[in-house]
């Protein structure tokens, strides 16, 4: 019974639409009607500012971490923490508290990985911010980190680097999360190809995007 309750709790944690609620409560703004219409970290930064964007990121990240740690906190045996983390990501993507229309799952997925394999998460953070500096695009960085996650989870155990052995559930979860993130960024990928993707005011913009075109 406790397992079912905690699995539901993991989904409900993921379903907290932090950006949407922050916009509505503190700014009287519905993020779905502004910018990209997304309720995640990037659009929150763009529309509501740095403080709101950072708050959204922190909440979205750590709800994934907390969900992953639920079975450890409650000394639950028999169900991998990754299942709880996956349910949090599903909740974030299809939140019951926001009409099942959620974000792109980047921050929450990162939080899940941090809760299960923190050094692997650090590796992905380095890839993410490296790509962000080179390309000046959150979307490109997210997709690049997703691909790097798949490469890492498949290759690192071969050399005992970061990941000491193969965990086939972790591989499956990484493949699922990476696929979800890339699919959720399909519109961004199209804009990148057309060189019209939105930029952050930092980095080299090596692909010469011009969102004003």
Swiss-Prot record:
Catalytic activity: an acyl phosphate + sn-glycerol 3-phosphate = a 1-acyl-sn-glycero-3-phosphate + phosphate
An annotated Gene Ontology molecular function: acyl-phosphate glycerol-3-phosphate acyltransferase activity
GO biological process per UniProt: phospholipid biosynthetic process
HAMAP family on file: PlsY
Protein name in the entry: Glycerol-3-phosphate acyltransferase
Pathway given in the UniProt record: Lipid metabolism; phospholipid metabolism
Organism whose genome encodes this protein: Streptococcus pneumoniae (strain CGSP14)
Primary residence: membrane
